[in-house]
Amino acid sequence: MVLHDDCKLTFLELKERRTFRSIVYKIEDNMQVIVEKHHYKKMHGEREQSYEEFANSLPADECRYAILDIEFVPGERKICFIAWSPSTAKMRKKMIYSSTKDRFKRELDGIQVEFHATDLTDISLDAIRRRIN
């Protein structure tokens, strides 16, 4: 697994400058990790709308890694790592994402909370709030 240069740079933009609300990463067939998409912090103005857009951007039948910058209480933000592995994803892809997860996380310093999600209920705002609190 090789991280494209944009992977770390985009994460640093989220962590240091808070430019992005979320980042979705994809492992390509050549085992290179790329930034598939990111959502800007003030995309729609409302936090709930931005979260919904992020959640709906996760593919229903493919694995992904995602980073989510969440703040339920002003000034108390958490950077969450999400290992997205829907039950309908191909077994080979699930194995690839599972076996590279720890190495990927080590490349991105500053992750505070980790989630493994197989459907959107695993990473609903309520589920995230319960886990963080």
From Swiss-Prot:
Residue ranges of domain ADF-H in the record: 1-133
GO terms (molecular function) for this protein are:
actin binding
What CDD domains does its record include? ADF_cofilin_like
- Domain of life, per UniProt, equals Eukaryota
Q: Does the keyword Cytoplasm apply?
A: yes
**Job description of the protein:** Actin-depolymerizing protein. Severs actin filaments (F-actin) and binds to actin monomers.
Which named protein is this?
Putative actin-depolymerizing factor 11
Question: What species is this protein from?
Answer: Arabidopsis thaliana
